[in-house]
């Protein structure tokens, strides 16, 4: 079997370094390119330098050259560079795995449009456990239905720049969808001062940013006399990286916009 050629954007970042290991660990993939922004001190270094691997792939800022020798790009960077990479992937018919969060509506529309021309897997979280959690939340929300106050609490490391996390927002979207609500209309982001009684139709969000928390997410359903909590805690970024590589292998040869639920076969159940 010919190995799938995977390039990584933001290879010198926290996720990028773990992705190098994940690609190296998978029996059916090989690292074909490593991207960093112009001016990065890592340019020219071996892509595996930070994790003790010798990949033979030099870190580059030449997107065109990297994509020309790759089957798929994995991108966990920021919205602006991700959208630029997305356009290049469409032009060169290279699949893309997007783990970047914080897109506005225009960015999400661009991703959706790209799915008409190449293979795109766009997910708020690539952890298998988190995606099973999404599946559970849909079931729980439908069964409990009305009468429960819903709150989502998430925590991440001090360096995370967007809040709430993409995973927390996706949890809210899943719950709202199961209840026939529009998250944009019912979400409450933080509370301060005299807020008055809680509106039972709302879904609340609370955010923690501290230390080196990789990712903690809890969905709370509370009513008089009982409380249901569904929690996922990540202790290593490898869970996200391994899921992204799994998605890259799965989307090979496909065109369309998919999420991790598709990769795991959960949308067919």
Swiss-Prot record:
GO terms for cellular component: cytosol. This is 4-hydroxy-tetrahydrodipicolinate reductase. The keyword Protease does not apply. Catalyzes the conversion of 4-hydroxy-tetrahydrodipicolinate (HTPA) to tetrahydrodipicolinate. GO terms for molecular function: 4-hydroxy-tetrahydrodipicolinate reductase; NAD binding; NADP binding; oxidoreductase activity, acting on CH or CH2 groups, NAD or NADP as acceptor. CDD domains: DHDPR_N. PROSITE patterns: DAPB (PS01298). The keyword Cytoplasm applies.
